[in-house]
């Protein structure tokens, strides 16, 4: 036997607490990224909530944030899962393109402020259906939707 019943329960409780702490930590990072990105995006004056410049900004900023605070590799993983690597339609291709560009911006940024300014500058230099790896892109205005996501 491995100790008394109260000792076994105490070990189980400690193990459960560790798992709960790990789960809380793992959940806090996505909440941080989504919270900061949506707060910033909602305050922007960019048009096109979905498929437009605002959507491109959201994707670029989220990816830059993850690359800056974590790793560009994490952006690759999320893009592969959420956007199917950009395959399927123009919207997914646009999102994957902006994720890759945002990750590059975040990976090279020297500061949080610079990273955010560089993403906004990339959006301001972007355009509809741009086929340039160094420019943010979005769909034509007739495809924009007035949504947050």
Task: Give residue spans per PLM region.
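Intrinsically disordered, low-complexity, mixed-charge
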Residues: 1-79, 84-149
């Amino acid at each position: 036997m491995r100790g008394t019943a109260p000792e076994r329960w105490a070990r189980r409780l400690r193990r459960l607490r560790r798992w709960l702490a790990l789960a809380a930590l793992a959940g806090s990072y996505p909440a941080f990224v989504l919270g900061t990105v949506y707060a910033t995006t909602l305050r922007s004056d960019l048009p096109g909530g979905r498929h437009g410049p605002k959507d491109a900004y959201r994707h670029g900023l989220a990816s830059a944030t993850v690359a800056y605070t974590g790793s560009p590799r994490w952006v690759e993983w999320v893009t592969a899962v959420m956007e199917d690597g950009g395959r399927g339609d123009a919207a997914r291709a646009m999102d994957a393109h902006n994720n890759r560009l945002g990750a590059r911006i975040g990976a090279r940024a020297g500061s949080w402020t610079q990273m955010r300014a560089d993403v906004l500058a990339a959006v301001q230099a972007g355009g509809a259906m741009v086929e340039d790896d160094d420019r943010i892109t979005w769909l034509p205005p007739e495809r924009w939707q007035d949504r947050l996501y």
